[in-house]
């Protein structure tokens, strides 16, 4: 019986450690880019479940599954030659660093969010663009006034089932964690 209690306690504490070991980095970068840290946490949970070395099906890397193209855009925008060099010579290494990955992922999220700022479905549209690309969001809203769509109406219009599930899952987790405080 004691071994069961010890094992359960260990599993609980490991689980808590695993899910929250990047909280400080997430909070730091979320503040810089004015994104709710619980949203960034929820996005990382969905993307990789906090596996910093994760590689996606089409070459996305790290916690926030950032593409090499996005990393190179970020490096160019920073104007720092060291980041440009690293993004060209070892982009996987750059994106496998949790701090850089979260920084670049938050930068990209904010860049996408600029397109949808102030809309009722701002967060859902930004998440959909993060997952499937902004051109898909435009496609899903082309025959309506996108500035007036509610979040639920937009999610219903998402034409890729996996993206619809991705957006819904992140929003649900985000709202659950935001309610806990």
Provide a role label for each language-model segment.
Residues 31, 45-49, 68-79, 106-118, ...:
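Sec-exported extracytoplasmic/periplasmic mature domains
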Residues 99, 103-106, 110, 124, ...:
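Amphipathic, non-transmembrane alpha-helical secondary structure
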């Amino acid at each position: 019986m004691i071994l069961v209690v010890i094992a359960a306690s260990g599993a609980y504490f490991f689980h808590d450690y695993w899910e929250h070991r990047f909280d400080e980095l997430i909070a730091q970068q979320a503040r810089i880019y004015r994104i709710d840290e619980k949203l960034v946490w929820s996005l990382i949970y969905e993307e990789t479940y906090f596996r910093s070395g994760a590689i996606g099906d089409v070459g996305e890397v790290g916690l926030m599954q950032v593409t090499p193209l996005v990393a190179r855009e970020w490096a160019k925008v920073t104007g720092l030659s060291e980041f440009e060099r690293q993004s060209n010579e070892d982009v996987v290494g750059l994106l496998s660093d949790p701090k850089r990955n979260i920084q670049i992922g938050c930068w990209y999220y904010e860049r996408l969010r600029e397109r949808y700022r102030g809309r009722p479905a701002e967060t859902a549209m930004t998440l959909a663009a993060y997952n499937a690309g902004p051109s898909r969001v435009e496609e899903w809203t082309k025959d309506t006034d996108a500035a007036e769509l509610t979040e639920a109406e937009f999610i219903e219009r998402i034409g890729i089932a996996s993206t619809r599930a991705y957006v819904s899952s992140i929003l649900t987790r985000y709202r659950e964690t935001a309610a806990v405080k």
